[in-house]
Amino acid sequence: MEGVTLPIVIVVPAENSTISSPLHVEGEAQGSWFFEATFPIELHNAAGAVIATGYGEATSEWMTNEVVPFKGTLIFPSQPSGAPGTVHFKKSNASGLPEYDDSIIIPVMF
């Protein structure tokens, strides 16, 4: 939809891409996704277990309602080749109130 800005756009990893450790992530998110210039990222294996955690870190001024580029790195243990997994990008929510939660999940392959 023209004129609509998504709250977060993931550039790397692409959906269903094959990943290996270290996994470098990058994209753009609205400034409201960050708290202290970061937001959490989790990598889940085929069983849904969290196998790595890290942060998307703003690479420019984050205290804005505009889009902010981010990068991050996740280091994870070896997984069976061809097994599915998911990368969870989670909006920072300093308030802890569920109405401010947001996330996007990207499917990947190991």
Give each language-model segment a name:
Residues 7-14, 18-24, 28-110:
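Ser/Thr-rich low-complexity repeats and stalk/linker segments
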